[in-house]
A protein has these predicted regions:
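Motif-centric detector for short Cys/His coordination patterns
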Residues: 2-129
Length: 129
């Protein structure tokens, strides 16, 4: 059963604009709370909410390497609450809820720096092998 207070919150987190920019490889989102984000495809790919990337619990995350030039070839809606992008490397199991995309946008700078730090610590590259 939906609570009375859930509806306004859900509406705020539903994007009013979703655009794929293939040339710059950026997903552009605007939300009803006034926030707008430009999320690079690589960023979305390395922070996929799938079990393949996140693991099944804390400490099981899999560092995603070689994703610098990844593109999104298709985006499928998932109900009225999410999208499922299909990436050029074949990854298609991440379901990105509006809430998750909003969270990625608000934390983008911090999350990106964390990713770069993990890559450096692992001696890994963003470039494809």
């Amino acid at each position: 059963m939906r609570s009375y207070l859930a509806f306004p919150y859900e509406r705020i987190l539903t994007p009013s604009k979703i655009l794929l920019h293939q040339k710059s490889r950026v997903l552009e989102l605007a939300f009803a709370d006034g926030r707008a984000f430009r999320l690079p495809y690589e960023f979305l790919r390395v922070y996929s909410p799938s079990a393949e990337v996140r693991g099944h619990g804390p400490g099981q995350e899999v560092l995603q390497v070689g994703k610098k030039d990844v593109t999104i070839t298709e985006v499928e809606p998932v109900g009225h609450y999410a999208i499922r992008p299909v990436f050029s490397d074949g990854h298609d199991t991440g379901i990105y809820s509006w809430e998750y995309l909003h969270d990625l946008g608000t934390r983008q700078d911090d999350l990106w720096q964390r990713y770069l730090d993990r890559m450096a610590a692992a001696g890994a590259s963003r470039d494809a092998a």
